[in-house]
Regions:
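A short-motif feature that recognizes glycine-rich, charge-decorated loops
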Residues: 68-108
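C-terminal motif of bacterial Sec signal peptides marking the signal peptidase cleavage site
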Residues: 16-18
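Bacterial N-terminal signal peptides that target proteins for export
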Residues: 1-8
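Short, surface-exposed binding/anchoring microloops in extracellular/periplasmic proteins
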Residues: 48-67, 71-73
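Bacterial signal peptide processing site
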Residues: 20-23
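Short, surface-exposed coil-to-beta transition loops
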Residues: 54-59, 108, 135-138
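A short, Trp-centered hydrophobic/proline-enriched beta-strand micro-motif
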Residues: 37-49
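Short, exposed beta-strand-loop hairpins at the edges of beta-sheets
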Residues: 122-140
Length: 149
């Protein structure tokens, strides 16, 4: 006779593994929308929200051309040098798509993504890697995307 607890755990594991998989179609669809527009030069604001030392620098204004970051400045004019490597890791739309893809693959505890309806880029990404760790959530918020010539 099977124990109810074992059945519950099996069902819970199946449900949780399906959560990440259910987000992959939206990722694929929106990434295709973004890529279909062949946007090579753009500027946007990025706010990274977390319990991090750089919160006063947010949002960043980032300009990207041909996949390369050509400028990145803090909204308050502060020095971003100490955090440059961290910021560069998520400073292109392509890298934000990769971040979502990685979170889905890793089956993080919670992943909430909202995509821009016109361009398809991830406008809001909130990741909570672990249910067991408090205050480890990170949010990435893209605003004011401007396509440049």
């Amino acid at each position: 006779m099977k124990k109810p607890g074992v059945i519950f755990l099996i069902l819970l594991a199946a449900f949780l593994s399906a959560c990440g998989a259910s987000q992959r179609p939206a990722l694929v669809q929106n990434r295709s929308l973004w890529e279909s527009q062949a946007i090579q030069h753009y500027r946007f604001n990025l706010k990274v929200g977390c319990f991090c030392p750089w919160n006063a620098l947010m949002p960043l204004t980032i300009e990207v051309r041909n996949g390369e970051i050509i400028s990145m400045v803090a909204s308050n004019g502060g020095d971003i040098t100490p955090y440059l490597d961290t910021f560069r890791a998520h400073a292109t739309i392509e890298s934000l798509f990769d971040l979502v893809d990685s979170a889905i693959s890793k089956r993080v505890y919670s992943l909430v993504v909202q995509y821009d309806p016109k361009y398809g880029f991830p406008a809001s990404i909130v990741i909570d890697p672990s249910r067991m760790i408090m205050d480890d959530e990170t949010g990435y918020y893209v605003t004011n995307l401007e396509v440049l010539p």
